[in-house]
Amino acid sequence: MSLFKLLLVLPIIALTACGFTPVYGTDGTANVLMSNVLVQGPKTRNGYLLTKQLETRLGRTTDPRFDLGLEITTTLDTLNINAKGDIERYNLIGSATYTLHDKQTGEITASGKVNSFTGYSATGTTVATQAAQQDAQKRLMIILADLIITNLIATADLPK
C-alpha cells in the first residue's frame, strides 16, 4: 500500500474508532429533529419567512416532539450616502433568539442567539428599493434559519 493511500485511509479509521457518526446519518442528531419540531406561529413578515425556511429544512409535523420559540429583531443601517445626501446602500442586520423545548420532558433542550446581516442598494425608484429591501429580508431570514438549524444540530442535548 502506498504512503498516499495509507494517509488517506488513516483518518477514516480514526473517525470510526472514536465513535463519529454523521449528523444526517440514521443515528445522527439531525434525524431526531426532522419532522419533529413545531415552530411557533409567526407574527410578522420576517417571522413568516424564518418559519418557512425552518419548516423547509426540518419538515412540517403534525405530532411534534419539540417546540421551537423564536424572537427576531432587525435593524437598518446606512452604508453609503452620495454627494447629494441620498442614501444609496443599506445594511439589514438581524438576530434571532431561539429556544427548543422537549414536550415530553418539559426541559429546554437548546437555546441561543444567531446574528447575521445582508445588504441592498437603494435605486432611483421607490418600488425597486422596496423590492430590494424585501429580497434582503428574505435572504437574511434564510441565513438566520440555517444558522439556527446548524446550532441545534451541533449543540442540542437530543435523545437518540
Language-model segments: residues:
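C-terminal motif of bacterial Sec signal peptides marking the signal peptidase cleavage site
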Residues: 14-17
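Amphipathic, coiled-coil-like alpha-helical scaffolding segments used for oligomerization/assembly
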Residues: 136, 140, 151-160
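Bacterial signal peptide processing site
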Residues: 19-22
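Surface-exposed short loop/turn segments
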Residues: 64-113, 117-135, 142, 146
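Bacterial N-terminal signal peptides that target proteins for export
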Residues: 1-7
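Post-signal peptide N-terminal segment of mature Sec-exported envelope proteins
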Residues: 28-51
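Sec-exported extracytoplasmic/periplasmic mature domains
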Residues: 55, 59, 145, 149-157
